[in-house]
């Protein structure tokens, strides 16, 4: 079954229209999606190239060892998502909600973050390299081994954040 079909089936399942919970493993995708409910969807060792997601819910989802290149996420809700060992390259995040998320071993390279929120999130070994953006907010963000090398953000507001054992 294609990655697209698995994703669309999960949306149907969440909306009570049949389908089945998504367990995407070792798949690849390059499609555009809008208005999907992918809450609790599990993605593992999958690659996305040029995929776009608009007004999509990823709450309580789990992503492990995924590769995303040139993808866009507009007005997506990633609250309580758990991501581990994922790499985002040249991806754009606009008005994305990542509150209460957990990022482990993730890397963002040459990505754009606009209107992002990371309230109450927990990061471990997260690299944000050569990224840019504006209006990135986080209250009570916690993180160790966080690296923002060569990244530039306007209106970056971290309140009560504790990164790399600093106040």
Predicted feature residues:
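Tandem repeat scaffolds
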Residues: 3-9, 15-167
């Amino acid at each position: 079954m294609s990655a697209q079909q698995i994703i669309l089936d999960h949306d149907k399942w969440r909306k009570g229209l049949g389908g089945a919970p998504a367990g995407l493993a070792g798949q690849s995708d390059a499609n555009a999606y809008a208005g999907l409910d992918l809450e609790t969807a599990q993605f593992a060792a999958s690659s996305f190239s040029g995929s776009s997601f608009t007004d999509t819910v990823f709450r309580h989802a789990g992503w492990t060892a995924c590769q995303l290149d040139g993808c866009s996420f507009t007005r997506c809700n990633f609250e309580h998502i758990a991501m581990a060992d994922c790499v985002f390259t040249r991806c754009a995040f606009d008005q994305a909600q990542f509150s209460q998320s957990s990022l482990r071993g993730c890397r963002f390279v040459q990505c754009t973050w606009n209107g992002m929120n990371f309230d109450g999130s927990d990061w471990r070994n997260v690299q944000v390299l050569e990224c840019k953006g504006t209006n990135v907010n986080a209250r009570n963000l916690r993180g160790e081994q966080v690296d923002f090398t060569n990244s530039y953000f306007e209106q970056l507001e971290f309140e009560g954040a504790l990164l790399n054992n600093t106040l």
